[in-house]
């Protein structure tokens, strides 16, 4: 496909938001060019492409920028309809499909609003505030586990494969070890089915290729702590 060569992702290696875009394109079989950004010295291309938020990830498709990772995932479904869907296909007048799409969007938004926010506080805080954030994270993971239920994947696109919520959430599994170390809990103990889901995802080629090791992420968290004077 000629369009595949026109995809460029402006990204940063440890960003879960960029990783979800990379995984989505890999799942769809789309070729893309990865361009690592120096977030301390952002490129002119990034600043021109996302002048409102001035942040990664940005997907350039034939030179046209698309910003915000969940928007990018939905754009990929729309722009490449012949590839595996992340969201259930939209069928005019099909209330069940509309509900499934809305539900997937809700849980992806939950990941961004709750899990990401709490995870950021976990490494920034100390003492009892950090312990409280650890308890909050454990409850967030239990909530996600309840939504997963007995399914193999959260799904969305069908066919027993990664769907919209899976792709939105799976990059954060590389941060689970850091959450455990900072929060004083075990993901396996508080949400064993979610931990099993993470292991299943971790055997999928697109995830293996585009997620860093938990240890490398934890080393990065240590750098952040020093940078912000947490330690």
Swiss-Prot record:
Quickly give the catalysed reaction.
Answer: RX + glutathione = an S-substituted glutathione + a halide anion + H(+)
Domain spans labelled GST N-terminal: 5-84
Q: Which domain of life is it from?
A: Eukaryota
Q: What is this protein called?
A: Probable glutathione S-transferase GSTU1
Keywords in UniProt for this one?
Answer: Transferase
Q: Where is the GST C-terminal domain?
A: 97-220
A Gene Ontology molecular function term of the record: glutathione transferase activity
Q: What does this protein do?
A: Conjugation of reduced glutathione to a wide number of exogenous and endogenous hydrophobic electrophiles.
What does the sequence similarity comment in the record state about its family? Belongs to the GST superfamily. Tau family.
Q: Which Pfam families match?
A: GST_C_2, GST_N_3
Cite the binding residues for glutathione: 15, 42, 56, 68-69
Give the CDD domains listed for this entry: GST_C_Tau (cd03185), GST_N_Tau (cd03058)
UniProt GO BP: glutathione metabolic process
